[in-house]
């Protein structure tokens, strides 16, 4: 089961978060609500390793709370939501940063961009260096710089989040590691001929072993689908390969005086392989709102 990103929606007491939650419908997120109060800091301290991103409605309490988080070395991806004026000031004036230099701001009027902004906040957080973790505003002289423990937590949090994103994105990172020069259409005529012969031979082995149990069929199918995926082979090419092989088998059965009906069972093999390949291609299609820097960061 693919892990969901754990979001904590932080609001002032009495705030109705319905419009915000409506922008986060789907299977990407697990959303929990949290309001400012005496237990706010204690809760974040106790659960900091389970939080993937904070979505914070700006309020009067923001500055004090997030200064405490910064001084405690609790650094998490964060999106601040607020009115236009507050967002514009915070984005343009570094001194207005409340938490750290990777925080993001979003105007309430643009809530439809919330999912994108969360992705951007996570991407910037993954690029956050331990030495640049805190905001660039002057530090309180009564507090020392973040110690090695705080820096270690940041690195741990980045690694944990990157692993979850790698799982969440599935084959997406692998997709961008494919080398186009190895695509079937990019091969020379001789290489294409060699590829076709090996491709048909592998498919024949899978078909013949599918119902016999002689070979580890699941492993063979996985290897075959990987071969097709990295060669950018289309589903129609696999279908064509299957039909040619079935014609060959049909002729052999006809010569032996046997019924061709058994060949209908081999459609299960085709369905199994096509389903595997389609799932790989489906999961490798990047969402339009996914920052490319996020892809490169988790490679």
UniProtKB/Swiss-Prot annotation:
Coiled coil: none annotated. The N-terminal pseudoreceiver domain (PsR, approximately equal to KaiA N-terminal) binds oxidized quinones. The KaiA C-terminal domain mediates interaction with KaiC, homodimerization, and is responsible for the clock oscillation function. SUPFAM superfamilies: CheY-like (SSF52172), KaiA/RbsU domain (SSF101215). It comes from the Bacteria. It comes from Picosynechococcus sp. (strain ATCC 27264 / PCC 7002 / PR-6). PROSITE patterns: KAIA_C (PS51431), KAIA_N (PS51430). Homodimer. The KaiABC complex composition changes during the circadian cycle to control KaiC phosphorylation. Complexes KaiC(6), KaiA(2-4):KaiC(6), KaiB(6):KaiC(6) and KaiC(6):KaiB(6):KaiA(12) are among the most important forms, many form cooperatively. KaiA and CikA bind to the same region of the KaiB(fs) form and therefore compete. This is Circadian clock oscillator protein KaiA. Key component of the KaiABC oscillator complex, which constitutes the main circadian regulator in cyanobacteria. Complex composition changes during the circadian cycle to control KaiC phosphorylation. KaiA stimulates KaiC autophosphorylation, while KaiB sequesters KaiA, leading to KaiC autodephosphorylation. KaiA binding to the KaiC CII domain during the subjective day yields KaiA(2-4):KaiC(6) complexes which stimulate KaiC autophosphorylation. The keyword Transmembrane does not apply. Residues 3-135 are annotated as: PsR domain, binds oxidized quinones.
């Amino acid at each position: 089961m693919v892990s969901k990103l754990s979001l904590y929606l932080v609001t002032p007491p009495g705030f109705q978060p319905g419009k915000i939650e409506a922008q986060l419908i789907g299977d990407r997120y697990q959303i929990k609500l949290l309001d400012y109060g005496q237990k706010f800091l204690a809760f974040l301290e106790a659960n900091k390793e389970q939080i993937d991103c904070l979505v914070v409605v700006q309020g009067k309490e923001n500055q004090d709370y997030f200064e405490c988080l910064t001084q405690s070395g609790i650094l998490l991806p964060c999106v601040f939501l607020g009115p236009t004026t507050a967002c514009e000031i915070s984005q343009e004036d570094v001194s207005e940063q409340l938490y750290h230099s990777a925080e993001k701001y979003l105007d309430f009027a643009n809530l439809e961009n919330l999912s994108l902004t969360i992705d951007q906040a996570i991407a910037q957080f993954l690029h956050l260096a331990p030495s640049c973790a805190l905001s660039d505003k002057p530090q309180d002289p009564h507090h020392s710089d973040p110690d090695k423990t705080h820096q270690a937590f940041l690195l741990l949090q980045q690694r944990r989040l990157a692993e979850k994103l790698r799982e969440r994105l599935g084959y997406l990172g692998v997709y961008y590691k494919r080398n186009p020069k190895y695509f079937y259409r990019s091969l020379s005529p001789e290489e294409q001929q060699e590829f076709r012969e090996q491709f048909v031979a592998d498919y024949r082995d899978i078909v013949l072993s599918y119902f016999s149990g002689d070979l580890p069929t699941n492993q063979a199918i996985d290897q075959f689908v990987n071969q097709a995926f990295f060669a950018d082979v289309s589903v129609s090419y696999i279908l064509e390969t299957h039909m040619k092989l079935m014609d060959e088998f049909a002729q052999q059965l006809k010569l032996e005086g046997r019924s061709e009906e058994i060949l209908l069972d081999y459609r299960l093999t085709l369905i199994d392989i096509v389903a595997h390949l389609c799932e790989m291609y489906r999961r490798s299609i990047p969402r339009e709102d996914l920052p490319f820097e996020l892809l490169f960061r988790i490679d």
